[in-house]
A protein has these predicted regions:
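Function-determining sites in protein domains
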Residues: 19-189
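Bacterial Sec-dependent N-terminal signal peptides
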Residues: 1-29
Length: 189
């Protein structure tokens, strides 16, 4: 009984001694918007091929298990989960895109100005570090005069990306609601 009384007293004391803090700001303080400065566009292009797949979460583990069964299975894994392509000249995977479950669409040039606002250098960053393995279900192939000049692999679930073929600073890609804007554009195609 005595032990119960002491335990209750300690809990009551701890509860009462917790400091409550008023978090509300005074009305005179206004939020200062983060100024974003834009730099160089990532790619100088005249065509974008958009590849997408509806790979289900449950099938991802299967990709890893099956990657050594055939060339198609290997590409399915390396394109969707891994680092393929490693360079802008590593284009063999493009021959397999439809075989590994991607659907190809052409992005109308009327969307290019909106896309340029996303694939551009930014000085401000409101990004975060993702703690998941990216599954690249959306891939953009940027071309100039029929030649591939840039590739962007996007994981909308993790907000991760892999962009190759540009010397622009891609570090702040994804800030300023880039993922939401890009997803909206791609869903409208």
């Amino acid at each position: 009984m005595y032990l119960k009384f002491i335990t209750l007293f300690v809990l009551f004391f701890l509860f009462c001694s917790c400091k409550k803090e008023n978090i509300s700001e005074s009305p005179s303080k206004e939020a200062i918007p983060l100024e974003i400065k834009y730099g160089k566009v990532f790619f100088d292009y005249d065509q974008i091929d958009y590849y997408s797949t509806n790979l289900e979460e449950g099938k991802i583990e299967e990709l890893d298990k099956n990657q050594n069964k055939s060339k198609v299975d290997k590409y399915k894994y390396t394109v969707t989960i891994d680092e393929t392509p490693e360079t802008i000249t590593d284009l063999a995977f493009l021959k397999y895109m439809e075989k590994i479950g991607f659907v190809k669409k052409k992005i109308d040039s009327s969307k290019f100005p909106e896309i340029n606002k996303i694939f551009i250098e930014k000085t401000a960053s409101d990004g975060y570090a993702a703690a998941c393995v990216p599954v690249f279900r959306d891939i953009l192939i940027f071309k100039k005069l029929g030649k591939v000049i840039g590739i962007a692999k996007i994981c909308f679930g993790c907000h991760q990306y892999r962009i190759i073929g540009t010397d622009a600073d891609t570090e702040n890609f994804g800030t300023n609601n880039d993922y939401e804007k890009l997803k909206y554009i791609l869903n409208s195609i």
